[in-house]
């Protein structure tokens, strides 16, 4: 068939809906509806011919219904159905009928019924899609993102967006019921240092000046508390120009909250109620607050990180004191020079091959390990290890006791600075859990991490940096440390971690100007710079700012965990790639020279 003939043929078979009005979605009909006249609309998922009868799986975002074209019911409609192909758009009218007993499909909610069609309207045709839209076919992510509107027709993707809608609805309802006000804050604001790079927007009316897209509504929500709004929330887009990972996007959605006249316990209580409601509405799962708490220091000691996955054990054990007097010179030297020696016990893993161990050594090197010492526990406390000969029998027994090591266990050691050892063993612990299939995606383990340091020293910048942001309140008992040992001061911050992923965090804020000025000074921000960047906030703190605090949740990351997705991109309708590109629209893209000139920008490329 020539292209022109094909186009004319397609044009003749496409029709309008006319007087047809949809009565049901494709997931709705059951045995109780047998005998009803119904009208369904959707896409052709599959077409099958059996003995002259044509079967179509008709799909919409809700589900699938089998529709049947039988020449004995309507020969004209049956003849018309011969032309149907995948992804054509249909409207059908027919009668709900029971499927023959041996033809029922228990995998579908509509699997007990089918529609005997007596009217068919072809609303649109489709070229052959670039990939099958079933669940079984593996499709490259780049191709899916290029044709995202097709990818979103796939049932799993449609379910993700439906679940996201339910989540947002549940959050709004909960916060509205708890006296929160939904208030919008500006998208075009000024650039302020919050850690990551800002996305900058040049001003056309103010030559050489730029807006920044917000990394968070932090300052505006604090100003709303000073304005007396008392309880604020917003489900808001935020932007960060940073290197991307599987759980990061340049633009992301944040559940943002702020409350006045509260302390940490009250904010945590409100938040746990919201999470409890969210999981009930989306997964019909009953959570039981209060959630567990762990301090930052304890989390680092036990799990090597500040976002502990507590679904499994394999905790870090501190062997530094044993190492200070042990025979192994490498461990002893590191321990005596202020480093640390720690280990984890992978129970019943002594069967790991040398190839496995070499692979784990290479993995540990990615996080700064100069090597990876290991021990396989044999009968009677014997060690199988390249380092076994360097330890006395008593030393081996002490280490085995500290690690609760039994025959068949596999021990891994880290010896270096605390920073390196925590990262190496923390990541190795997670890698072992993945290899041993210890991470149950259907288990939801929540823990609050508290008592973070207020700031840490950045050697590259030669100044202190906030762990969270400069507006986090220090503990009252640590105020005097701001001038003498700011890295020793603890903050009134709290993060909520789910299955080893930080899903939200917040703090009590500074509400007194003198304290805010002292924190900025400790961060190396002098009065002139503070007035330039935060003068509006400092002035507001002088005009009756109430005690306040809040937190923010990453909605995308939370939905990734709720849906069990491997990537945050699977829960966002139109995500960017890890290079911050949109394969669908081909953004970012070049713009006309005239547009740049209007913005006082000089192009540096040749046309």
Curated annotation (Swiss-Prot):
CDD domains attached to this UniProt entry: AspRS_core, EcAspRS_like_N
Major subcellular site: cytoplasm
Positions marked as site (Important for tRNA non-discrimination): 50
Localisation: Cytoplasm
Top-tier EC class: ligase
Stretches the record annotates as Aspartate: 218-221
Keyword tags: Aminoacyl-tRNA synthetase, ATP-binding, Cytoplasm, Ligase, Nucleotide-binding, Protein biosynthesis
One Pfam family linked to the record: tRNA_anti-codon
Catalytic activity, EC: 6.1.1.23
One Gene Ontology molecular-function label: nucleic acid binding
Binding site for ATP: 240-242, 249, 502, 554-557
GO BP term, example: aspartyl-tRNA aminoacylation
Binding site for L-aspartate: 194, 240, 468, 509
GO cellular component: cytoplasm
Signal sequence segment: none
Domain of life, source organism: Bacteria
UniProt catalytic activity: tRNA(Asx) + L-aspartate + ATP = L-aspartyl-tRNA(Asx) + AMP + diphosphate
Function of the molecule: Aspartyl-tRNA synthetase with relaxed tRNA specificity since it is able to aspartylate not only its cognate tRNA(Asp) but also tRNA(Asn). Reaction proceeds in two steps: L-aspartate is first activated by ATP to form Asp-AMP and then transferred to the acceptor end of tRNA(Asp/Asn).
Family according to the record: Belongs to the class-II aminoacyl-tRNA synthetase family. Type 1 subfamily.
Subunit-structure text: Homodimer.
PANTHER family named in the record: ASPARTATE--TRNA LIGASE, MITOCHONDRIAL (PTHR22594:SF5), ASPARTYL/LYSYL-TRNA SYNTHETASE (PTHR22594)
UniProt name for this protein: Aspartate--tRNA(Asp/Asn) ligase
